[in-house]
A protein has these predicted regions:
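Active-site entrance/lid segments in N-terminal catalytic domains of soluble metabolic enzymes
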Residues: 1-167
């Protein structure tokens, strides 16, 4: 594939087209769209916000919270989020067939963002190339990205926000 006037870049150790699927919230981008972007040589971006999980028949697993306390239900939410995002990454990686790159998108202000991000990155080592993050000031994201050897692509709303994150 070629694009007039556009040259590939090296991202995460592989040559890709500098075409990035925009990160969207709440399960808006999944393994199908992200895997297709990567298979075409671009950078697919999976929403790691309430991502879908599937049962053995390929049906979406409903996220049902059965715990009695708010704290326990929050832990259920985190578990669903990690399981769903990991499943989406694995499926996208398979569709990509070794081409392009896969990023994940998280909303820093969602409940349990850091725990979810670390859980997903821990279980998808070698499959995720970068993390985009908006909805808040993800001060700790650069440290997390460094620890997991992935790129950090913050979504910033202003020059002031950029300066604060750059410190």
């Amino acid at each position: 594939m070629s694009f007039k006037g556009l040259k590939p870049i090296v991202y995460g150790g592989r040559e890709v087209w500098p075409l990035v699927e925009g990160g969207k919230g709440v399960a808006a981008t999944n393994h199908m769209s992200s895997g297709a972007w990567a298979a075409a040589g671009g950078i697919g971006t999976i929403s790691a916000v309430n991502a879908d999980s599937y049962d053995s028949e390929g049906k979406i697993v409903p996220q049902v919270y059965s715990a009695l306390t708010r704290k326990e239900r929050h832990q259920e939410l985190i578990r669903y989020a990690i399981d769903g995002a990991v499943e989406q990454v694995r499926r996208a990686h398979e569709i990509a067939g070794g081409k392009g790159a896969i990023n994940i998108n998280v909303l820093w202000e969602m409940g349990g963002a850091q725990e979810i991000l670390e859980g997903v990155l821990d279980l998808t080592r070698g499959m995720v190339t970068g993390v985009t993050c908006g909805a808040g000031m993800p001060y700790k994201l650069s440290e997390i990205a460094q620890r997991y050897n992935v790129h950090y692509l913050p979504i910033v709303s202003s020059a002031r926000a950029f300066r604060a994150l750059w410190k």
